[in-house]
């Protein structure tokens, strides 16, 4: 296979164990999320609610049929070329007799109701809940991944829900959510599922949102933008070497994704996980903030998030709060107006202040929202429009 490593059926990377739902909750920093008690469980005679390795093969989008049953995937920058029976780098897309299939369509391994602030979205319907889904797999291999137990797994090794797109929308409505979020792993790898759900949200009064690393090719991104209302994108570092060594990817496609989403009018927030000694250099942070200001605009929300030792970086140390505060000062100095600190519950930098008059607009304590001073998307004090989505979708 050219362009990426071969993933054999059911194979896990060395040192990875099979995921249980309990382990996922325990291992995630988002342990406050609640596993949704699905109100529309199918009858046992028809199917089981959860099955290990459940799969619904679905013909993949963006594939190029080559000679001798070779298929090239055109979804992400890896552009994997696979022989019959092989999978791409993500571990969830497989060549079957010259046709590429997604193995995770309609079978997520994680279904949660989260505060929208957990994504994180600080400028999208504050205080609301988001119906959050993820499948096994990822097209990146971050050494610091917090959800590695599912992102680095194949669908054979996870317990999966039978949850087609229409049931996602029904579940979100039943749970009182105002949005659906494709999150926890890289949602690009369940592209067909994500876009199908996104199309259904349009007539259901739900926002379609994602938290992504932005590792996607231009053509599928243009189509995805049609069904997305908001996106949080991880800009893991402003350094190609960091992406190569710690992410197993490239920086340039992520920058292109950010610019495309801005151009297409998708609400955009950016997250940078600050890892001591790896991407916390002041000049690197200043350069990143200047790029965000110039290419995405000074009103783009930026979240500096605290690193905790996980996965292959468990011997490293958490980010000092002072490092995050210094990064925020650099961002403000560069001209960014909405700069937040994450994974530090109770810090004043969780709050939103008006870029016009500086007064408090939204008070937060972790994922909890307190006082709000917005009126129809504008500052209650000075009337300046605040970037974001503040009104429930009709």
Located regions from the model:
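Short Cys/His-rich "knuckle" micro-motifs
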Residues: 83-86, 153-154, 364-366, 389-392
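N-terminal [4Fe-4S]-dependent radical SAM core
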Residues: 17, 47-72, 78-134, 149, ...
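N-terminal secretory signal peptides
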Residues: 1-19
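Extended interfacial segments that mediate partner engagement and assembly in macromolecular machines
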Residues: 102-183, 188, 194-195
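N-terminal twin-arginine translocation
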Residues: 16-23, 33-52
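Conserved AdoMet/S-adenosylmethionine-binding subsite of the radical SAM
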Residues: 162-322, 330
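Short cysteine-rich clusters marking metal-coordination/redox-active sites
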Residues: 73, 142, 354-357, 379-382
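Short linker/helix segments within small regulatory modules
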Residues: 367-374
